[in-house]
């Protein structure tokens, strides 16, 4: 292996610095900068398997597999280093290379890092050794892939999928798979008892700190907080301090999302904790709301009606109920006078929209949809907390819940497309149900397509492998026995926008909508098939299966009216019979997470979102790097580059003739958001957990509260579980859509995980001082009795120090509001 001299090192560094700043306008410069960075790092990485084992063997939980197959591994790794797959990896641009060395490659003694080749060897070796350790898991793999016999053929199976990047793993898996005593779960959910000061202390110092130490994103339910008479802001600041401590000097920042229901007496103070003008804000954490459908029904039908607030100690069973049972309990408590305050429901919506526009959150989930579509009945123990990215849903009161994530790189499933990976076997053996399905999507490519279509066979192969990868991480890397036994899996995707563009379609074209549903139906079907095989051969069926809806022949899509299936119902029925007979290893299957971290490695678009920008920046641990849309620049004609560079790649700013040529590369901000919501609804029947559905608004649209409020109502009407993950705002003054650094006042998550750490996902830019009207807190005891004891008959109390208006013609206008200072502002 060639090494670099001091002079060469300096020269390479200067060349990289010169080239990387051109990445958004010169794709060749981006590729060259990435290749040079790999060359620059060659001196500090391991070169042979023998050297790798010498440096890292004391870190492995199973060194024996690597030692036993050392020579064979050297052969595989050497062949990979000369392969087209490796060439694609090192040619994926500067940000991809930076991400490897900055985050994913394991560091050993004396600062020696594993090489990219050995990184993939470690991941595949972990999966292979785990598969060989569990005889049932190996038997299931051989049932799915009968051609696999020897240990090294098991290794090859995982190695080929990982190095071809058809299967991409979460950040915890990529960083710690194979490392002794590591937790590989991406998400941790907990709803602790917060009813007393002692309970809060236990929850924070005994449990939360441990979860953050394990470098996982955490979702915490805080609806039960405040019963001890303390302000919720105190609890939020304590959580924020925990996060900031654990993130100091850390390669992979983590965070916490705190979830509350909107009937809580301190809901306004809860929302306030993220507002940039709040000098005690909590920039390191995120807020989320589990909103009952009653709230949306009242806002839509009678927006001036009262919304009642309750102290959690007087709220009866509100926290544990949903649907009609929740409504009955809510009105029973109101009739009994148990409420401690009331506010116009418009006023509360004002505050929610205000916070979303200025801080990007709260994340908003529909309580009924999350609970009613779960695999068992949750009435009386309803979920009211999700994970850090609002796509993983599990009950978490009785024990901590976890989820292991992976995702499929959809562009690798294109037929004859550049960078596509061809299947290496004939589909004549394996799971008979999967073999009965079509190999290609019937949706035909459009004009300008670079591929001949989308390969459903490759998608199913990748989904099957991802299910085995997640099974390995569950069996060897779960933090508790309870979470391991539940075997919650979340399979997502990246590069959906790339697929549509490569097939010649705009994101919301009819063919895109058709393939959108088809992809997730086949993923859900394949994950169920594979999980059933694993359960049969390992004899590990998740607890509660016999009481689950699956045991009665149920599928998640049964609960969604009007679901069109591309897989014949006869084949679904055969799968149902198999599951009823053999059970399931996993309790959950599909969760569409943000994939910012691993999408940077592959150079694909993030998750299932439309393109965020064609030329943007990304903040890493060490620098702010340019991030070009590689699919876009691959399709740009040479004679169009200058015009596109002038507008930062923004298609909407081009002259009409040129704009028409590149319409399929419009950004998420250019599309009608209701169309994007509808596409989320189309795939929802096959997403048994949830999807991190974000909204993308232009600044002029976000300046009207009605825009965002109407979109939230529309998502509710369509029954989405996650109504809104982020609210992202495109600044009107920007000539190019740029993902900028968060200001000192704001900190927005970064994403991993396949991930989740919203510490990599940059927040929407804050708007100028709040664009929303509404009270910060209204705790009235009766009609017209305000926070300071003053009365405004027939009006709604608003502290003028917090009153900031939308346009006068806004749906959420402020007619009838009366201004005066509340007691705390006088």
Curated annotation (Swiss-Prot):
For the site labelled Interacts with thioredoxin/glutaredoxin, the residues are 822, 825
Q: Which reaction does it catalyse?
A: a 2'-deoxyribonucleoside 5'-diphosphate + [thioredoxin]-disulfide + H2O = a ribonucleoside 5'-diphosphate + [thioredoxin]-dithiol
Q: What class of enzyme is it?
A: oxidoreductase
Q: Where is this site: Important for electron transfer?
A: 725-726
Q: Which SUPFAM superfamilies match?
A: PFL-like glycyl radical enzymes (SSF51998)
| Ranges of biased composition (kind: Basic and acidic residues) | 749-758
Annotated residues for binding of substrate: 171, 186-187, 217, 387-391, 594-598
Give positions of region: Disordered.
747-769
Q: Which EC numbers characterise this protein's activity in its record?
A: 1.17.4.1
Which NCBIfam families would you find in this protein's record?
Answer: NrdE_NrdA
User: What does the function comment of this entry state?
Assistant: Ribonucleoside-diphosphate reductase holoenzyme provides the precursors necessary for viral DNA synthesis. Allows virus growth in non-dividing cells, as well as reactivation from latency in infected hosts. Catalyzes the biosynthesis of deoxyribonucleotides from the corresponding ribonucleotides.
HAMAP family per record = HSV_RIR1
Q: What is this protein called?
A: Ribonucleoside-diphosphate reductase large subunit
The organism named in the record is Epstein-Barr virus (strain B95-8) (HHV-4)
């Amino acid at each position: 292996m060639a090494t670099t001299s001091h002079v060469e090192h300096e020269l390479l560094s200067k060349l990289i610095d010169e080239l990387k700043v051109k990445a958004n306008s010169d794709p060749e410069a981006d590729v060259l900068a990435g290749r040079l960075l790999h060359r620059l790092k060659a001196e500090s990485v391991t070169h042979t398997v023998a050297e790798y084992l010498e440096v890292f063997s004391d870190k492995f939980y199973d060194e024996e597999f690597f030692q036993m197959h050392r020579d064979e591994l050297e052969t595989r790794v050497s062949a990979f280093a000369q392969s087209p797959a490796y060439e694609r990896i090192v040619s994926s641009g500067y940000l991809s290379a930076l991400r490897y060395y900055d985050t994913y490659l394991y560091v050993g003694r004396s600062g020696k890092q594993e090489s990219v080749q050995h990184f993939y060897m470690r991941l595949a070796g972990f999966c292979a050794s785990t598969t060989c350790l569990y005889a049932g898991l190996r038997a299931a793999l051989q049932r799915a892939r009968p051609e696999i016999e020897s240990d090294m053929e098991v290794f090859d199976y995982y190695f080929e999928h990982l190095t071809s990047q058809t299967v991409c793993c979460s950040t915890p898996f990529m960083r710690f798979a194979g490392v002794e005593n590591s937790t590989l779960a991406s998400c941790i959910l907990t709803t602790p008892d917060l009813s007393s000061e002692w309970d809060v202390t236990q929850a924070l110092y005994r449990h939360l700190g441990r979860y953050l130490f394990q470098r996982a994103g955490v979702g915490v339910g805080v609806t039960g907080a405040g019963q001890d008479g303390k302000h919720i802001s105190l609890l939020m600041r304590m959580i924020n301090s925990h996060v900031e401590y654990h993130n100091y000097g850390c390669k992979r920042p983590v965070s916490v999302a705190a979830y509350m229901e909107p009937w809580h007496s301190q809901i306004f103070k809860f929302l306030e904790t993220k507002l940039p003008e709040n000098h005690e804000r909590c920039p390191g954490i995120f807020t989320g709301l589990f909103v009952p459908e009653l709230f949306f029904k009242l806002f839509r039908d009678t927006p001036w009606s009262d919304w009642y607030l309750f102290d959690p100690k007087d709220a009866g069973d509100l926290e544990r109920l949903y649907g009609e049972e929740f409504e009955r309990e809510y009105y029973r408590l109101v009739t009994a006078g148990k409420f401690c305050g009331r506010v116009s429901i418009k006023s509360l919506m004002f505050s929610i929209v205000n916070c979303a526009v200025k801080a990007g959150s709260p994340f908003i989930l529909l309580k009924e949809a999350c609970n009613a579509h779960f695999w068992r009945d949750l009435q009386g123990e309803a979920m009211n907390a999700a994970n850090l990215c609002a796509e993983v849903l599990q009950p978490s009161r009785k024990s901590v819940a976890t989820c292991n994530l992976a995702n499929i790189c959809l562009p690798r499933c294109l037929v004859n497309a550049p960078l596509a990976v061809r299947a290496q076997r004939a589909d004549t053996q394996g799971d008979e149900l999967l073999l009965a399905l079509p190999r290609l999507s019937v949706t035909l490519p459009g004009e300008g397509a670079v591929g001949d279509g989308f390969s459903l066979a490759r998608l199913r192969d990748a989904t099957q492998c991802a299910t085995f990868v997640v099974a390995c991480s569950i069996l060897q890397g779960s933090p508790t026995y309870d979470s391991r036994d539940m075997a919650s899996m979340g399979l997502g995707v990246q590069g959906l926008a790339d697929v549509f563009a490569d097939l010649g379609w705009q994101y919301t074209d009819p063919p895109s909508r058709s393939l959108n549903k088809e992809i997730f139906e086949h993923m859900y079907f394949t994950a169920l098939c594979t999980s059933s095989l694993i359960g049969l051969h390992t004899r590990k069926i998740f607890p509660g299966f016999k009481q689950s809806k699956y045991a009665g022949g149920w599928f998640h899509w049964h609960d969604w009216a009007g679901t069109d299936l591309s897989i014949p119902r006869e084949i679904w029925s055969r799968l149902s019979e198999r599951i009823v007979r053999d059970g399931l290893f996993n309790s959950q299957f599909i969760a569409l997470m943000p994939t910012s971290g691993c999408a940077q490695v592959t150079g694909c678009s993030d998750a299932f979102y439309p393109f965020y920008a064609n030329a943007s920046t990304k903040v890493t641990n060490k620098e702010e790097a340019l991030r070009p849309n590689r699919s876009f620049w691959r399709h740009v004609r040479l004679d169009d580059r200058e015009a596109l560079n002038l507008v930062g790649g923004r298609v909407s700013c081009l002259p009409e003739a040129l704009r028409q040529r590149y319409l399929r590369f419009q950004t998420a901000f250019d599309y009608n958001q209701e169309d994007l919501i509808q596409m989320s609804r189309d795939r929802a029947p096959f997403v048994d957990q949830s999807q991190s559905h974000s909204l993308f608004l232009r600044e002029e649209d976000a300046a009207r509260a009605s825009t965002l409020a109407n979109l939230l109502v529309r998502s509710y009407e369509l029954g989405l579980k996650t109504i809104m993950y982020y609210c992202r705002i495109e600044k009107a003054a920007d000539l190019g859509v740029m993902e900028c650094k968060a200001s000192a006042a704001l900190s927005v998550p970064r994403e991993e995980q396949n991930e989740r750490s919203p510490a990599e996902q940059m927040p929407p830019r804050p708007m100028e001082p709040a664009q929303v009207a509404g009270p910060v807190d209204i705790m009235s005891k009766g009609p017209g009795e305000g926070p300071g004891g003053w009365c405004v008959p027939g009006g709604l109390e608003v502290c003028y120090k917090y009153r900031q208006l939308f346009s006068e013609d806004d749906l959420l206008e402020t007619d009838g509001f009366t201004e005066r200072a509340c007691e705390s502002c006088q």
